[in-house]
């Protein structure tokens, strides 16, 4: 049956099949080949020009977007054909695939499109590049390294396939991890080395500061016995009898320095003596505990004697006795035991002979002068201060030749003499402190009332 003549009528322009296949292919975005150039298929290039007299091959209307211009590249002049061109209705013969002989692409961001994420996923360039049959699919891989690089843990790799229709979700890297474990380890090593250098700088600064302060402390400790004797004597010369009688605080300040020096020195001697191991023989054990008990008693009496002697009312004789005589009694024995004797179990020896014997003799003379007459009080302070000053000068400038005694008996005699002098002095101080406290607080009467009395027969 013959077809009607209506099929020869021209097709309206708003018909969906108005544009031919060549026009539709011309409106598609250009493709890319292996060389990175944009080239249309030969079928589209052959039918891109409209032929006169054919209404179906007219140029596109104003509503259709114009074709994009071809971008120039460094491989513009190379001859390349696609391996699988689209079939053309007018060209029935199929072209054999031709392998491209283009030079290798220049290394850059376009040479490795599968290693970098696309900056604009919706662009036609990214879509056509991913759709090209000659390039592998663009796969974005993210490497996640363990938090503890020291442990032997294999890195887990998560691959996320990117589609040309779905947008890419960019995940920023963690600031605490790096993509290279060697870089991470070097960063940690630099941090540790910087911290160690800072700690070493602090330790060096502290050691240098301690080394600078050590001579100052040594100077203060050297002049402490001399100042402990002369300071109360100067206070006695500055203030009169009435000032000491009215002000207990002035009496406390006058006695604080000599008693504090003796208490500190005996406490240090007791600590150093107790730090050594206890000897095994019976004789050494007896000496060890006896000397420990004496040093501890001297420390306690020196601390407790400050308050009773400050509370006592000083008359004319007491205003000379407490500031002048007491420091000359308490300071020299403590100074001798701390500076001139090496108190170690089984190794007790005298380090300085001449000045130590002189100080011991001067202390005995002071005791004899004090108990004889009141007018000899100032001489005790003068003799003690001069002997201590000579000891300090001999240690600093070597005025006297320091040589130990020839025999062990002489060394033991000097040590025993010093200990006997210290025992007499601190026994007198302890008795005086108890007497003053009993006079003020009547301690003995209260103790007698508390203790049970014997029944009368």
Swiss-Prot record:
Q: Report the InterPro entries cross-referenced here.
A: UPF0328 (IPR019081)
What domain of life does the native source organism fall in? Eukaryota
Q: Where is the composition biased (Pro residues)?
A: 102-112
Q: Where is this region: Disordered?
A: 1-112, 157-183
Q: Where is this chain compositionally biased, Basic and acidic residues type?
A: 74-94
**Short name of one Pfam family for this protein?**
DUF2463
Membrane-traversing stretches: none
The family assignment reads: Belongs to the UPF0328 family.
How is this protein named in the record? UPF0328 protein ECU05_0030
Q: Which organism is it from?
A: Encephalitozoon cuniculi (strain GB-M1) (Microsporidian parasite)
Its ancestry begins with:
Eukaryota, Fungi, Fungi incertae sedis, Microsporidia, Unikaryonidae
